[in-house]
């Protein structure tokens, strides 16, 4: 089967879509600094986001997706009430490295991208 005809569950397509959404890359970047509790992660994401604050529901959904794909590990303590924290797995750390490299490439190429956009817009 050719690469163009694979199903929607293709891992490459799924992970690229995940990285391309509004919050996933930011979550990876923040968790690369260390394990964080849900509320701390939400606070940091809200502080560094150029857009609106992330909602509790969206953060929970993103974390569940990252956990399902093996990029994030969830730790629940036996305290009352339980404390939940999140950290990158080894796969998540490797994905973070790749995401960081993509960010660096965009930064290095931003002038070239802006020129291409200007040329396109004036055509």
Describe each region flagged by the PLM.
Residues 67-87:
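Beta-hairpin "wing" of winged helix-turn-helix
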Residues 10-58:
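N-terminal helix-turn-helix DNA-binding core of bacterial DNA-binding proteins
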Residues 1-11:
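Long, low-complexity, charged/polar intrinsically disordered regions in eukaryotic proteins
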Residues 11, 29, 76, 90-123:
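Amphipathic alpha-helical dimerization/coiled-coil segments
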Residues 59-67:
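Basic amphipathic alpha-helical segments that dock to polyanions
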């Amino acid at each position: 089967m050719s690469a163009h005809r694979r199903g929607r569950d293709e891992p490459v397509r799924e992970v690229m879509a995940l990285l391309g959404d509004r919050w996933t890359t930011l979550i990876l970047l923040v968790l690369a600094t260390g394990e964080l509790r849900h509320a701390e992660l939400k606070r940091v994401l809200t502080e560094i986001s150029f857009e609106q604050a992330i909602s509790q529901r969206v953060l929970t959904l993103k974390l569940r997706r990252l956990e399902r794909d093996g990029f994030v590990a969830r730790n629940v303590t036996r305290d009352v009430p339980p404390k939940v924290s999140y950290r990158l797995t080894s796969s998540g750390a490797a994905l973070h490295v790749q995401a960081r490299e993509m960010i660096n490439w965009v930064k290095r190429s931003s002038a070239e991208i802006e020129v291409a956009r200007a040329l396109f817009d004036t055509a």
